Amino acid sequence: LLGLPEDAPERKAIRLINPINEDLSLMRTTLAPQMIHAIARNQKNGCLEGRVYEIGNKFIPKDLPLTEYPDERETICIGIWGKEENFFTLKGLVDTVAETLFIDFEYVEDKKTFLHPYRTAKILYNGEEIGYLGQLTYEIQKEEDMRESAYIAEIDLKALRPVYGKVPTFAPISRFAKETRDLALVMSKSVTCGE
């Protein structure tokens, strides 16, 4: 489904010896396939716009075959779709996760086989990659019979555990009124939004 290359870390899944059924024979290394299926199922049932999320665990083996327990990572996967949804709507939702924890994420251009090449970014926190966001490729949307564009994000919550429950500090309100201005900039296409 994701079109991952053979050496992709997401392909290094742990196979269960006695699964409930063949569809559940691998421990998840990403929540993306289930989110893609959930979005497709909703669209097939007539829900042409929506937002869903899942908080679940993914299991990253240190070595295969297993010699020690895998790294279990609590992860949130967010999916949105519809005429009014776009990359920046999803980025706003991811920023809301950061604001809730009183932290800032950084976004850097990225490439993933299942996401649109120019509408994809990796999410960094303190310089460490903790997730990604982007639009599903047209090929996946067509393969899953999606009628509306879909976007997904995946964030490693385990990497954010150190900031859970920290009390923020606040600055006093300024005595001077805030002024906002509308500003348009003209620059080269090679300049990224982070610069």
Label every PLM stretch briefly.
Residues 1-195:
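Extended beta-strand-rich architecture
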